Each structure stands twice: as C-alpha cells, then as structure tokens.
C-alpha cells in the first residue's frame, strides 16, 4: 500500500484485508474496485466494482472516482484497491487527485507513478480517467 497523495492510498486486495495495516495507516474508508468482498474489519468499505480493460464502463469508473473525491473532501483517509493495485486503483486515484487538486491528469498519473512503482493502467482506464476529469471541469 502506498500513499500517492495526502490521505489517498493505493493498494491490493491483500492490503484491504489487513485490518492491522489499515489501522496503522489511519485508513478511514476502503473503496473496493473488485467484485470480491474484502473483509476490512472495522474499517468502512465502499463497493465500487469495475472491470479492468476495454470492457470497463464509464459509469462504474465515474462512480468509483466520485466516491474517492467525496470521501477525501470529507477529510477521510481513503485506500483505493483492486486485485494487484496496478491498473484500476491507480487510474481511479489519479482521476480523483486531478479533480481534487485541479491539476492535470498527466501530472496526477506522474505523482501516482512516483509513489507506487507497480502502476500500469490499461489504456481504456486512462481514457475513462480523462473523461472524468474533463466532465468535472465543465
């Protein structure tokens, strides 16, 4: 699990199920992008399942990213996770970060990559992120 921006963490399914790790990192909410149900213990979990790759639907992506934005605006420390923490969760985190900070999506992705080496989002998710950021600036 890596903190890619203040209060915004990206991780794996294993991270989401490690209640001790979640507590040590001060995580208030877990946004789960998988179709599995991780046991986050006492930490609040928001299910926002979405597929990886070209079959990903924009509505699912936008709902997940908007959930992260809302939780961060409420001052919560949020872990966004998918299976490996390499494609879906970094893309959603970068989109939320771009929306929260009014910075460009490229800069947000660069920051995520600088803080988490296992980042390789599918091109379709990068496109969904760009649409989310663009729609938020209108």
Where are these regions (language model features)?
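Cys-dependent protein tyrosine phosphatase-like superfamily
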Residues: 1-77, 93-138
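A phosphate-binding catalytic loop at a beta-strand-loop-alpha-helix junction
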Residues: 76-92
């Amino acid at each position: 699990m890596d903190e890619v921006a203040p209060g915004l963490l990206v991780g794996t399914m294993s991270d989401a199920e490690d209640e001790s790790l979640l507590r040590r990192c001060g995580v208030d909410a877990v946004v789960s992008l998988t179709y599995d149900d991780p046991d986050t213990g006492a930490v609040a979990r928001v299910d926002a399942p979405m597929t990886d790759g070209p079959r990903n639907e924009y509505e699912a992506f936008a709902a997940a990213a908007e959930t992260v934005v809302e939780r961060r605006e409420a001052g919560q420390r949020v872990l966004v996770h998918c299976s490996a923490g390499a494609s879906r969760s970094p893309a959603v985190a970068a989109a939320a970060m771009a929306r929260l900070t009014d910075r460009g999506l490229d800069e947000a992705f660069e920051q995520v990559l600088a803080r988490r080496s296992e980042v390789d989002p599918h091109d379709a998710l990068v496109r969904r992120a760009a649409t989310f950021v663009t729609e938020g600036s209108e």
